[in-house]
Regions:
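Acidic helix N-cap motif at the loop->helix transition within catalytic regions
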Residues: 44-52, 90, 94
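Glycine-rich, basic loop-to-helix element that forms the pyrophosphate-binding segment
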Residues: 47, 61-77, 87
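Short, well-formed alpha-helical segments that are part of the catalytic scaffolds
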Residues: 7, 12-27
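Short aromatic/hydrophobic "clamp" motif used to bind/position activated sugar donors
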Residues: 82
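A conserved acidic beta->alpha catalytic loop
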Residues: 23, 37-48
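Catalytic core of nucleotide-sugar-dependent glycosyltransferases
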Residues: 212-219, 226-254, 269-300
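Donor-binding/catalytic cores of nucleotide-activated saccharide
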Residues: 90-190, 194-202, 206, 214-229
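Membrane-interface aromatic/basic loop that binds lipid-linked glycans or pyrophosphate carriers
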Residues: 275-410
Length: 410
């Protein structure tokens, strides 16, 4: 077994979960190369019909929280590599297979691929995120500093779902992670950051590529959405604990002080983020708790620079699923295909090149069959324009209800 795809599940809307597994199944991955491992963390919903439809392996547990669910998935995974897909998200048709190839061919411990937000009206990718806009390879003592250098500003580094990991790396850090997970009844925030930290600390070589998208869905049921004072307190408690654990477990290297400084700046970022949430939701009395949790002298609200990686966006076609279906048909075809790429975008051309490279018989010709024309609405281009989007970041306060509403619907 080459790859285990771990899907942790807890009362996710069934339609989202079905879309998640459907996207994995309808991809360039070969059936014999991977397993879908569902960790059902005590859901009250019955998902057996969806799980059976897509041939997933399921382990049911009592509700113990996402951290323990992820660790159980790592323990039970049978693949040489491991990747995570959240149960309400989806992936494009050519996401995991190229990562698997790249990792195998280059002996990577961690491989990144691109990602995009998926809202109710559109999908867009953040080109301010360096893992999307640049190519990189880090080796040896440069790996962990690469994880820390952005100080929490770039989504791709501190979440699990943008990456494929060598299974031996993740299984090797279970001894570090289990005591932390078991020290709390529910460690339900920033646990992915903690897993990534220990994984990068144990990795010798990491790199990225750009063949597809992980679609991170934004919706009202997400656990990361702050609704109550209780949830905000929980987020502060676990994020500050995560940063403290990272500080305590830095390796003794020549750049240790540099990494310490990065973690402290990350703490400053999170103190501003959570203070902004507190102010926007009338929880200003949490001032001292936030300040003490993040070990900062004073609290300030979020700055524009804190959100800079999200200000440069690229809107994806509204018909991206239709495009993916057509590209998957090319992948699955057993005959020679003549394809016209006259109106194809960069993503489509790159996908066709990848398919050809894998030995599929494709000839590019103006007379060939046309792939779907990418369609992007003018209003989406305007909304996601850097100037317009940046003004939105400035005028709509972080943590405010109107910003949460716009984030979900725009």
């Amino acid at each position: 077994m080459k790859l285990s795809l771990i899907v942790c599940l807890y009362n996710t809307p069934k339609s989202y979960f079905s879309e998640c597994l459907h996207s994995i199944k309808n991809s360039t991955l070969k059936t014999e190369d991977y397993e879908i491992l569902v960790i059902d963390d005590g859901s009250t919903e019955n998902y057996s019909d969806v799980i059976n439809e897509y041939g997933a392996r399921v382990i049911k547990t009592e509700n113990r929280g996402i951290f323990r669910a992820r660790l159980l998935g790592i323990e039970e995974a049978q693949g040489d590599y491991i990747s995570f897909v959240d149960s309400d998200d989806t992936v494009s048709f050519n996401y995991h297979f190229p990562m698997l190839l790249h990792a195998e061919e280059n002996d990577l411990d961690v491989c990144f691929n691109d990602w995009a937000f998926h809202t109710e009206r559109t999908r867009y990718s953040c080109f301010g995120d360096s893992s999307i806009s640049k190519d990189f390879i880090y080796e040896g003592d440069a790996v962990l500093p690469a994880f820390l250098k952005n100080e929490g500003r770039e989504h791709s580094y501190f979440v699990l779902w943008t990456k494929l990991f060598k299974a031996s790396v993740l299984k090797g850090i279970l001894a570090d992670l289990k005591p932390i997970a078991e020290s709390e009844e529910r460690y339900n925030y920033s646990e992915d950051t903690l897993i990534c930290f220990f994984a990068f600390k144990s990795s010798k070589k990491i790199a990225n590529l750009h063949t597809g998208y992980y679609f991170y869905r934004i919706h009202s049921n997400q656990t990361v959405n702050i609704i109550s004072e209780e949830r905000l307190l929980s987020h502060i408690k676990f994020m500050s604990k995560t940063l403290d654990v990272m500080l305590e477990n830095l390796p003794e290297t020549d750049n240790q002080s540099e990494m310490e400084a990065s973690i402290k700046k990350w703490a400053g970022l999170m103190s501003r983020t959570h203070y902004s949430h507190a102010k926007a939701n009338k929880y200003s009395h949490l001032y001292d708790f936030i300040k003490d949790s993040y070990h900062v002298d004073t609290l300030k609200k979020s700055t524009f620079h804190d959100n800079s990686s999200y200000s440069k966006n690229k809107v994806l076609p509204v018909n991206i699923l239709e495009i993916d279906t057509a590209l998957l048909d090319l992948w699955n075809s057993e005959t020679e295909d003549h394809v016209c790429l006259c109106e194809a975008n960069k993503y489509m051309r790159r996908s066709v090149r990848f398919i050809k490279k894998q030995g599929k018989k494709i000839k590019v010709s103006p007379e060939g069959r046309k792939l779907p024309t990418p369609r992007v609405k003018l209003i989406d281009r305007i909304i996601m324009n850097k100037v317009v989007y940046s003004l939105g970041l400035i005028f709509f306060k972080k943590g405010s209800r109107i910003r949460a509403f716009l984030k979900k619907h725009i």
